[in-house]
């Protein structure tokens, strides 16, 4: 395959020089076509206030208060952040045995992992 001159595309579609059926030919639009340019954008001017909304009374001036909760449910109190601190007690009678056992298990696991990886 020559990358400087690739083969012609033979996919589906019209033959070169003929427009696809159902599409107008490219070039100047036919007579009667709408004038060129962009259509007007945005909404038409409605005045103030917008005429589509009823005249509600104005809200209170100044900073607004927080919206109250739904009146059908009781209002919850402030959040309770109860934290229970539990400290595990140490047993002095077997601390040496526990440390030795934990060390042996760690060494055994490391040896098994090294054997599996090699």
Curated annotation (Swiss-Prot):
One Gene Ontology cellular component annotation held by this UniProt entry: membrane
Entry keywords, A to Z: Membrane, Transmembrane, Transmembrane helix
Membrane topology: Single-pass membrane protein
Signal peptide stretch: none
Subcellular location: Membrane
Region of interest (Disordered), residue spans: 1-82
Membrane-crossing residue ranges in chain numbering: 95-112
Presence of keyword Transmembrane helix: yes
Domain of life: Eukaryota
Positions with biased composition (Low complexity): 1-54, 64-74
InterPro entries reported for this sequence: CYSTM1-like
Family to which the UniProt record says this protein belongs: Belongs to the CYSTM1 family.
UniProt-recorded name of the protein: Cysteine-rich and transmembrane domain-containing protein 1
Organism name: Danio rerio
């Amino acid at each position: 395959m020559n990358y400087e001159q690739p083969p012609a595309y033979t996919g589906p579609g019209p033959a070169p020089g003929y427009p696809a059926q159902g599409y107008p030919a490219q070039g100047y639009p036919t007579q009667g076509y709408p004038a060129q340019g962009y259509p007007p954008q945005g909404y038409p001017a409605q005045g103030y206030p917008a005429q589509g909304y009823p005249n509600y009374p104005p809200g209170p001036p100044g900073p607004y208060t927080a919206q109250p909760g739904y009146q059908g449910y009781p209002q919850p109190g402030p959040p309770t952040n109860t934290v229970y601190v539990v400290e595990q007690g140490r047993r002095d009678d077997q601390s040496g045995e526990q440390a030795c056992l934990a060390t042996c298990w760690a060494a055994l696991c490391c040896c098994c992992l090294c054997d599996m990886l090699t």
